[in-house]
């Protein structure tokens, strides 16, 4: 059951259910398309909570493309999951093997895969969540995704018709058919986002 205090909006719950149903049907990859500002990180955090409680996933890797997003995600996991076993935390110098939630930039994790394969098994993670999957993955970081034998979830705010075909292929979705979509127009219509106008300044 989804913890509504983490992600209680109807579309967040719908996204989590769509992903878990896909995993239950033995599909090992999923892709969420959610507009910026609709709570992708909260949705991912609530999904981790569901999967850990159901014992579907013990160790989770959350990939981001910038350190600022890494820090934001770390704060979310610590706050909403009361999770002390996260990586990185202050004082960490090496890649530890005793944590439950790992939050890393793609570049840092690529270094781990390339240089520390003897320490990190392909079966180490049970779930990998890739944030901003549209731009950060296919060419440069596909090596990370291919190395680990885990359930995989891509997150992106890019409208589904703008997501590159390679991203759909990476998460085993037909082009234009993400696992779940909550677009900008729907978020505005629901009152969760404010519409905007582009003004030309002369």
Model regions: which residues?
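A short acidic, often aromatic-flanked loop/helix-cap motif at beta-alpha or helix-coil junctions
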Residues: 92-97, 186-190
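ATP-dependent helicase/translocase motor core
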Residues: 1-59, 68, 72-83, 97-101, ...
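Conserved AMP-binding/adenylation subdomain of ANL enzymes
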Residues: 83-85, 191
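Short beta-alpha junctions and helix-cap segments that line functional grooves
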Residues: 47, 74-76, 87-91, 115-116, ...
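Conserved helicase motor
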Residues: 67-68, 88-95, 106-111
